[in-house]
Structures are given as C-alpha cells and as structure tokens.
Amino acid sequence: MGVRRATIVLLAAVAALLLAAPAPAALSDGIRYLRLQQNGDGGFGEPGERSDPSLTAWAVVGLKTAGSSPRRPEAAAEYLHESGDRNVTDLELRILALDALGRGTGILADRLRAKRQRSGRIGPSVNSTIWGILALRAVGRPAGKASVRYLLRAQRPSGGWAWTPNGAADSNDTAAAIQALRSAGVSRNSRAIVRGLRFLRRLQNRDGGFELARGRGSDAQSTAWAIQAFVSTRRAAGRSAFAYLARLQRRNGSYRYSRTYATTPLWVTSHVVPAVAKRAYPPK
C-alpha cells in the first residue's frame, strides 16, 4: 500500500511539472506563425496588410524574448533602421528591437536619454517611462535613479500602475512596470513589487486569464504580461494562466485576443510567445 501511494504521489508530481512547463509544440507553433508574417520589405504586418514599424518592433521583441529571431533578421533590421518614430514609445520599441537584432543603438539611446526630465519621467507618461527604462537596460545603459524613483512614486494606492500619473491602474502597465523595476535592480521582495503582484492577482478570473481592468474579461495579452511579471520576480503565475492561453491558440499557431475575438493575431501572438516561453522583458 505504501509503494502504491508513493507511486501515485510521484506520478502526480510529474504531471504537475509537465502542466507547469510551457508546451514545446505550442511555443514552436507560435514562433513559426510570427516568423511567417515577415513581408518582402523586411517588416511585419497583420495578415494581408502592409508592414508596420510598431508591429515589426513587437514581432522582433517577441521572437527574441521567446528565444528566436525573424527569418530574415537583416531585412527586419534595415526596415526598422529606416523607420521613423512617431512618439517616444516608438523610439523605445525600436531600440529594443534593433538591439535584439544585434544592431548598434547608441545614437537612439542618446536620443532617448535626452527625453528624461528632471523628475525622472521619460517622455510624456508613466508608460513611456516604463518602456524607457526597459529600453535603456536592454542596451546596457543605467535606468537612472530619478526614473526609478519616478516610477515607484507613480504606483497607485491600489498597488497597480496606470498609463498616466493620475489614471486608473491596469494590469498591462502594472506588469510592464514590475518588469522595468526588476530590470533596474529593484528587489523582487520590495514592497512596491509585492503590491504590484497582488494587484495583478486580483485581476485574474476563474478561467485562469487576467483582464486589463475589472469587468473587462480575460484576454491573451493581459494574461501574457501578468505571467511575465511573475516570471521576472521568480514567482509562479499558476498553471491556470498557461491553460487559459493554451485554449486561445489557433491551428495556425497564432493566438486569439480572447474567447470572443480573434483580432490582430500578429500583435497578440507577439505578446504571448514570451510568456509561453516563461521569459520576461527586456529580451536577453
């Protein structure tokens, strides 16, 4: 009886490990889908649409973070190199993507540093500060003590972060802020990080997915970013979150936005594959 019980316990432990690990087929299918969306000009676009600089940057960053790369990395780099920046976050994404492709980003990083204000804010918002920190850390530049302090002060009473200083906190900005703070060396056990993770956990639904804000319903991107936040703090997001993402994967490898909508598959899949790979931003 003792041997039988020990065998059952062992099998249960193995099953738990298998469920917690990212499914190799799911990850490889998602990566393959992304790689196939590269257009002739080197950029990436949604199916049947022209290349877009922002989507190209997201695809490259998603692939790199998940441990892969575009089919034609040099073409992607050239496309991004020739693309302009409509705003600060475009610049930050371009830095992340070009660095992921092995291109020099010194001039762009200097431009980004020039966007830092005396308060530590980078660009016009909390969101642009988050991605500014991630971009600078990706290329080996210091985040800047003032920027880290600004981001810590921007934490809302709920424990989350918002796009703007006085906005309503949401899961996406909170997850990204946690990853930015971790990349800047903030302890995973700091009060700010722990409060941020608790805020995220309150936005997890019974289906295992996370939602952008209370009442919005679970979606793939919010779930993926929440997983990455937990990964960055070396904590488990929980099997139910991965199971939720698995249910949204389509036969072609892409991910639905939610159970109801299957819009912008390139954009959504770019955000999901790093989470399935259990890797956080910035890409390494």
Would you name each region that the model predicts?
Residues 20-22:
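N-terminal signal peptide c-region/cleavage motif recognized by signal peptidases
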Residues 1-10:
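Bacterial N-terminal signal peptides that target proteins for export
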Residues 26-39:
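Short N-terminal segments immediately surrounding and downstream of signal-peptide cleavage
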Residues 9-18:
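Bacterial N-terminal signal peptides
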Residues 73-80, 105-113:
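Alpha-helical repeat scaffolds
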Residues 37, 82-83, 115, 154, ...:
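Alpha-solenoid HEAT/Armadillo-like helical repeat scaffolds in large eukaryotic proteins
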Residues 25-26, 43-72, 85-106, 121-146, ...:
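An alpha-helical repeat/solenoid feature that recognizes helix-turn-helix modules
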